[in-house]
Amino acid sequence: MADRLTRIAIVSSDRCKPKKCRQECKKSCPVVKTGKLCIEVTVGSKLAFISEELCIGCGICVKKCPFEAIQIINLPRDLEKDTTHRYGANTFKLHRLPVPRPGQVLGLVGTNGIGKSTALKILAGKLKPNLGRFTSPPDWQEILTHFRGSELQNYFTRILEDNLKAIIKPQYVDHIPRAVKGNVGEVLDQKDERDKKAELCADLELNQVIDRDVENLSGGELQRFAIAVVAIQNAEIYMFDEPSSYLDVKQRLKAAQVVRSLLRPNSYVIVVEHDLSVLDYLSDFICCLYGKPGAYGVVTLPFSVREGINIFLAGFVPTENLRFRDESLTFKVAETPQESAEEIQSYARYKYPTMTKTQGNFRLRVSEGEFTDSQIIVMLGENGTGKTTFIRMLAGLLKPDDTEGPDREIPEFNVSYKPQKISPKFQNSVRHLLHQKIRDSYMHPQFMSDVMKPLQIEQLMDQEVVNLSGGELQRVALTLCLGKPADIYLIDEPSAYLDSEQRIVASKVIKRFILHAKKTAFVVEHDFIMATYLADRVIVYEGQPSIDCTANCPQSLLSGMNLFLSHLNITFRRDPTNFRPRINKLESTKDREQKSAGSYYYLDD
């Protein structure tokens, strides 16, 4: 019997449509043919029900289902007893829970749909864990007995007896304006319980928007406002679900410092974050989550920050001796040797002149530069320094006011552009969209294997474009952008809405595609780990955001990063195992050493 329970059946509620099919799953099931009720479904039922006790894991129903609505997944054997929560029959289940410790920041890292938000809800006391018994849920006494002997027992006892107050900063900040009315200052005044309003507004740069209505805020401003609203209240448990989306590098670090400032000896702070360098900077320890998205999720034991992130990147949990991803990710040391004169001659293919552009009271000056084939140029700068403006001038969508230099014309480039904000207007399925926009590439086997397979576009093919989630839209937009034949690919924030695993995949896809297609890509990216992984050269933006900025000419990764980080006043070191960049804690020995040596970005170990 022990063998039988190690698999779970997942029936996707939005794909299973018994009215439109011939109940192939039930007709083909060998257990049903012997007269047992393994799969129960009638034309009138909403969903097929699969009994996990009777299922023998043959996988025939998975192949026969015309809508691909069924997954049968074999679980690791030792997971039978640790179920924390299951939403219903044939749905997602979560194993174990992350263990928060008072006075420390717990970071959670894992793919989307693997139970991070479920875990947050349970830890906030908003969702009562049912230990997998969704028909007869246990009472709290039994739940406490289940967790006895672990730190979670004390935690839940405190939640029940002391009525700990938990506040969650939601993941989707763009839904906030629907719920909150009024202007920023008023809302903060209502919530202010710690007399920190002035300090928080200065830290999170909210003073410019203090009189604005909440519904008129941009994404980044909403995010900072949401962080401020949580941080200004008094609570024992603070939870932040993705506090860095929409923010630029400087604001990410500011937000991280604000989150860390909430620590008190008996308070808990829990953060879900996909930008690994920010997570590294924020947390004191980390729990990874692995499993199958939408099917089951497992929380590992807590690790130290460095170990946890390295485990996640390596895709292997040593304590459980379990591999949860096929390939690991390491970072190359991207320092090109001095090129010889002939190579430079053959390389300098495209030039653009020095340009200026004024929009309203914002002035952007671009120094002349050149770039070559098979190169990825990453643009580094805060929000509002004119990165998108520069991209649009290269694309020929905006005319510069003034150009100077020997070749004053901007050469004509064929450009494929993925904008920062993606809004779905197409009234049909993803398949139609790809067919209409990029028919040639989407049929091409190399494009299939280089771009569409890794980004998992196949699963989205029959969904309506308007119903896609943020991350799914982002992947479709990336596919469309790379599928269009062009000389230059301009990609604005490819990591927004993607989870940490998809970011790794997306950066690999962009890199491989640019190398194979021998084209150039300009990428704007705020996730530091992605930016370092992608960049061959960097363009640094300096100046006052939204007032007067300068874009330097493309330079090598080392000198560019050094210049950029010196503006931000932070230093990076490299992790010895997989060479990922790690932020040094402010005023640590290493931080002071590197600042005095002037090497903010460390490449040589």
Swiss-Prot record:
Q: Which SUPFAM superfamilies match?
A: 4Fe-4S ferredoxins, P-loop containing nucleoside triphosphate hydrolases
Record domain 4Fe-4S ferredoxin-type: where? 46-75
Q: In which tissues is it expressed?
A: Expressed in roots, stems, leaves, flowers and siliques.
Question: What InterPro entries does this protein map onto?
Answer: 4Fe4S_Fe-S-bd (IPR017896), 4Fe4S_Fe_S_CS (IPR017900), AAA+_ATPase (IPR003593), ABC_transporter-like_ATP-bd (IPR003439), ABC_transporter-like_CS (IPR017871), P-loop_NTPase (IPR027417), RLI1 (IPR013283), RLI_dom_1 (IPR034348)
What residue ranges are annotated as transmembrane? none
Q: What induces it?
A: In plants undergoing RNA interference.
Q: Where does ATP bind?
A: 110-117, 381-388
Q: Spell out the subcellular localization from the entry.
A: Membrane
What GO MF annotations does this protein's record show? 4 iron, 4 sulfur cluster binding; ATP binding; ATP hydrolysis activity; metal ion binding
Q: Which keywords, in A-to-Z order, does the entry hold?
A: 4Fe-4S, ATP-binding, Iron, Iron-sulfur, Membrane, Metal-binding, Nucleotide-binding, Repeat, Transport
Q: Which family does it belong to?
A: Belongs to the ABC transporter superfamily. ABCE family.
- What name does the UniProt record give this protein? ABC transporter E family member 2
Q: Which organism is it from?
A: Arabidopsis thaliana
